[in-house]
Amino acid sequence: MTDRTPPPGRARRLFSRTSWPEARFLADVLRTETFGGGLLLLGAVIALVWANSPWGGSYSALASWVPWPGGSDLHLDLDLATWAADGLLAIFFFVVGLELKREFVAGDLRDPRRAALPVIAAIGGMIVPALIYVGVNLSAGGENLRGWAIPTATDIAFALAVLAVIGSHLPQGLRAFLLTLAVVDDLLAITVIAIFYTGDFKLTPLLLALLPIALFGLLVQRRKTWWWALIPLAVVAWTLVHESGVHATVAGVLLGFTVPVLRGREGDRHGLAEHLEHRWRPVSAGFAVPVFAFFAAGVSLRGADLGAVITDPIVVGIVAGLVLGKVLGIFGSTFLLARFTRAELDRDITWTDLLGVSLLAGIGFTVSLLIGELAFEGGAADDNVKAAVLTGSLIAALLASIVLIRRNKAYRRIAVKERVDSNRDGVPDVFQHRDG
């Protein structure tokens, strides 16, 4: 692999291309997440239409149906909507755990110089929206402040679905930045959920959960992918984490962290983490997340006082955090990084491109809705939170589309250049002749 460290005295380029293997991996992720984002949008639209139709009562009845009333002893007498949030999203977070470990072991995040930009941007994109939300809700205080983390999340599947719709050929360096930013964003979201949105904490079940997680890790470290052993261990780990009061999706992340990234034998084409990610990402993007979106997005606006909704400090804080906070946090932190270091934008990238990507990061659908449910579960603000997340994400998507559509011609020129392979060795020329 070509050394990407710039020579002394040369400015480091922000959003430069990754290596060719990393580019191929990102392309595979993009295809799956874009398709999944389309299904996510479809699920959300169906839920909204159904919940606001004359048959809205049947939607509510379906979401509140408890398939296993006898599971109360294990606290598993959950309705379908909760099973989607706690159960199916564990698959999503398992893939996130695999992705995180891969990025830190073999991806861009293993290099501190390349990791600095997405990490700083993700932190900025978390702090500023949270501050905006707190600022708006500070006078209200009390329960309102529990929602501070709602506008801090980015939904990469939704963002990529928007990109697919507007047809933008986003440069490879920016695609890598957007995906890596989302990975770091997911890590921060997992940390926030585990620390700030834990219910009645019980230490014993959490300690017991370490046993099936350790056995799961022992098997995968030895490359034993017996589904009849791994899936029951994962279910037991999920059940114990759920019983502990920590949100059950954290079990998915911990299981993902145990999977080895590097190839075990010389003949292996891929590490086990990449293999499992390739197998489970379609399940996550094509089923788990769309079903969660279907149950989470069904907010009924019939009979609602729209004036009261749009002036609710919770709604204003979430929308402002997603639309303004993400842009100020990501764009601002990147600008400051370039301003106070020798870093500069890659030749193919403009600050307008970064503005569009920063707006895309304001689409905070899946994890924002999840945090909203944890912060205001069963409360009067629950529907307002859903409406705010949907509204803020829609505004961010529209603004990003306006900015990025104007750059389409330039994107196409870059895309053509990134496909040129003059010596026909299967590796485009731009990945062989990079000046960092």
UniProtKB/Swiss-Prot annotation:
GO biological process: regulation of pH
Gene3D superfamilies: Na+/H+ antiporter like domain
TM ranges: 35-55, 80-100, 116-136, 147-167, 176-196, 201-221, 226-246, 283-303, 313-333, 354-374, 385-405
Subcellular location: Cell membrane
Organism name: Salinispora tropica (strain ATCC BAA-916 / DSM 44818 / JCM 13857 / NBRC 105044 / CNB-440)
Function: Na(+)/H(+) antiporter that extrudes sodium in exchange for external protons.
Membrane topology (UniProt): Multi-pass membrane protein
Name the UniProt record assigns to this protein: Na(+)/H(+) antiporter NhaA 1
Underlying gene: nhaA1
Keywords: Antiport, Cell membrane, Ion transport, Membrane, Sodium, Sodium transport, Transmembrane, Transmembrane helix, Transport
GO molecular function annotations of the record: sodium:proton antiporter activity
Source domain of life: Bacteria
